[in-house]
């Protein structure tokens, strides 16, 4: 990426997004774009469309997600699947419509089966049941991964999906 390229970091106030934002700044990237949830509700497709129309990002890093600990994942299952699917649909969809050069989607290792052997191999994805407590979140993240893969295969886009391992650090807002 060029140092002056317009890079939209969705979720730039969160744990991963803020680390990416800070790293890009330290490396000299000067045209970073971020919006707080208050400024841009990623669940609102029209708002996301208007944002992309106005900003025209060249690169998108999708680190935004509805996250929580074990208790929240157990109690608010519908919220986790619905909100994460909506965020992904809106951001990946507008990235495609606006011809971004590259999109980086951050998933989660919870997409792998509950009883996957260690170390986990990519090939075990979708081979056996997920951990029940975070299954809706995991299914949404699998959908995001498959959206990226499908856009790449059908349209030749450059969408990359990565699955960070368990994370903690500054700006972590999950609650157990």
Predicted features, each with a name:
Residues 4-27:
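N-terminal Rossmann NAD(P)H-binding glycine-rich loop of SDR-like oxidoreductase domains
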Residues 27-50:
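Adenosine-cofactor binding site in Rossmann-like domains, unifying the SAM/SAH pocket
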Residues 90, 132-163:
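Active-site Tyr-X1-5-Lys
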Residues 80-88, 99, 104, 140-141:
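Short alpha-helix in the Rossmann-fold core of NAD(P)-dependent oxidoreductases
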Residues 41, 111-113, 135-136, 157-176:
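Flexible, glycine-rich beta-alpha linker
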Residues 45-85, 94-97:
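NAD(P)H-binding glycine-rich loop region in Rossmannoid oxidoreductase-like domains
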Residues 3, 89-134:
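Conserved Rossmann-fold NAD(P)-dependent oxidoreductase catalytic core, especially the SDR/UDP-sugar
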Residues 10, 35, 60-66, 103-109, ...:
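SDR active-site strand-loop-helix element
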């Amino acid at each position: 990426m060029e140092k002056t390229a317009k890079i939209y970091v969705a979720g730039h106030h969160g744990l991963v997004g803020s680390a990416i934002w800070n790293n890009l700044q330290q490396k000299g990237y000067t045209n970073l774009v971020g919006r707080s949830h208050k400024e841009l509700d990623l669940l609102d497709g029209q708002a996301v469309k208007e944002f992309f129309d106005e900003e025209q990002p060249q690169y998108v890093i999708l680190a935004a997600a509805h996250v929580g600990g074990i208790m929240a994942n157990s109690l608010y299952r519908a919220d986790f699947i619905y909100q994460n699917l909506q965020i992904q649909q809106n951001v990946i969809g507008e990235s495609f419509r606006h011809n971004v050069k590259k999109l980086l989607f951050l998933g989660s290792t919870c997409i792998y089966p509950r009883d996957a052997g260690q170390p986990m191999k990519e090939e075990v994805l979708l081979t056996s049941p997920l951990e029940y407590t975070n299954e809706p979140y995991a299914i949404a993240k699998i959908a995001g991964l498959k959206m990226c893969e499908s856009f790449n295969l059908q349209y030749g886009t450059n969408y990359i999906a990565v699955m960070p391992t368990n994370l903690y650090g500054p700006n972590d807002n999950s609650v157990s």
